[in-house]
């Protein structure tokens, strides 16, 4: 078994402090565009679905609108199905799978279920291909009241 740290920052087995988090963040670079690859796809769904901005994340100079896509019509008597993608930004298939589902299969559920799809919970993570947000917080471990992860708090 190896004791080698996943990141060459800090000490294995010790939680990161502010200095280690800043050191990690300084190594992060944008590798793809949330706007070009995700938001444009969501915009293309507006004719068939209700698209709403349920929040906004601001990290440094970057602002990320958060979108939810709902089936139309929304019928109170039907069960509701929630589909999320991109809680961890490096899980690209979840983001594109949610978008593909909306384009190709969502209409199969018309009259049977209300669909609420959040294709990309963590847009900064998506752009940087990271599990964490820029505060080194894992949004997937943070779906709770008073969440330290803004991505998770926006859905709470």
Protein language model annotation of sequence segments:
Residues 78-80, 92-156:
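Active-site/substrate-binding loop(s) of hydrolase catalytic cores
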Residues 66-77:
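Short beta-strand-to-loop junctions in surface cap/lid or active-site-entrance loops
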């Amino acid at each position: 078994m190896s004791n080698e740290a996943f990141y060459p920052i800090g000490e294995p087995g010790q939680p990161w402090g502010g200095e280690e988090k800043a050191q990690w963040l300084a190594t992060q670079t944008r590798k793809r565009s949330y706007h070009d690859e995700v938001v444009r796809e969501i915009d293309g769904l507006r004719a068939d679905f209700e698209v709403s901005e349920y929040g906004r994340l601001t990290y440094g100079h970057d602002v990320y609108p958060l979108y939810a896509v709902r089936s139309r019509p929304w019928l109170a008597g039907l069960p509701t199905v929630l589909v999320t993608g991109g809680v961890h930004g490096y899980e690209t298939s979840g983001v594109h799978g949610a978008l593909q589902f909306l384009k190709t299969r969502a209409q199969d559920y018309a009259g049977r279920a209300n669909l609420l799809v959040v294709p990309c919970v963590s847009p900064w993570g998506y752009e940087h291909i990271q599990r964490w947000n820029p505060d080194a917080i894992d949004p997937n471990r943070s779906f709770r009241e008073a969440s330290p992860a803004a991505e998770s708090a926006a859905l709470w």
